C-alpha cells in the first residue's frame, strides 16, 4: 500500500513541476505576472475598497454614477444646483453585472458589502456614520487611471483615487479630494 501512495505522490510532484515549467516567473517571486491589466471592474473595486479604509461594513450603490467627465477627473465639483444628478439621492440607471459585484466583493477581502439600489432610502435607513459609497466608471489608460469615488454623507463628498496595475492586481492610492 505504501508503494502505491509513494507512486501517486511522485506523479503529483512531477505533474506540478511540468505545469510550472513554462510559466512567466520572476526569480524573486513565486507568483506569475499578468502582462495585461485586470478588468476595469477590478480597478473600480480596488478604488472603492481603498476609499472604504478599514470599515468592516460598507454600503455600495449598485451601479456606476453618471457624471460629467470633468467631475470624474476631479477638475470640477458636482454641481447639484447646476443640474448634475446627485448620485447619492437617486438610483443608477444600470445595475452592476454579477462579475462587477464579484470583483467588488473580492476587493473588500471578507468585509461586509451591502449593494444598495436606492441610495436615498439607504441613507435614511442606515445608522449615522455608516459608509455608503458610489463610484464612476474608471478612466484608464493602459496600466494606470483614476476612479472618482463619492462618499454619501448624505451629500456627495468626492475622492479621486488613482489606480495602477502592478502585474498582479490593481493598487489604489489617493490623488486627493475632488473639488467641492
Cite the ranges covered by each PLM segment.
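Short beta-strand edge/turn micro-motifs at domain boundaries
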Residues: 158-180
Amino acid at each position: 500500500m505504501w508503494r502505491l501512495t509513494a507512486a501517486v505522490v511522485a506523479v503529483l510532484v512531477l505533474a506540478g513541476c511540468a505545469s510550472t515549467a513554462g510559466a512567466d516567473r520572476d526569480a524573486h517571486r513565486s507568483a506569475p505576472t499578468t502582462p495585461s491589466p485586470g478588468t476595469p471592474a477590478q480597478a473600480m473595486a480596488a478604488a472603492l475598497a481603498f476609499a472604504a479604509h478599514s470599515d468592516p461594513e460598507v454600503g455600495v450603490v449598485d451601479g456606476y454614477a453618471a457624471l460629467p467627465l470633468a467631475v470624474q477627473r476631479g477638475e470640477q465639483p458636482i454641481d447639484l444646483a447646476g443640474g448634475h444628478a446627485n448620485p447619492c439621492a437617486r438610483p443608477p440607471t444600470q445595475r452592476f453585472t454579477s462579475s462587477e459585484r464579484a470583483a467588488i466583493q473580492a476587493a473588500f477581502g471578507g468585509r461586509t458589502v451591502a449593494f444598495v439600489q436606492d441610495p436615498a432610502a439607504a441613507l435614511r435607513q442606515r445608522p449615522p456614520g455608516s459608509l455608503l459609497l458610489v463610484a464612476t466608471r474608471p478612466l484608464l489608460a493602459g496600466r494606470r487611471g483614476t476612479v472618482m469615488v463619492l462618499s454619501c454623507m448624505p451629500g456627495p463628498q468626492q475622492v479621486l483615487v488613482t489606480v495602477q496595475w502592478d502585474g498582479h492586481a490593481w493598487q489604489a492610492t489617493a490623488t486627493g479630494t475632488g473639488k467641492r
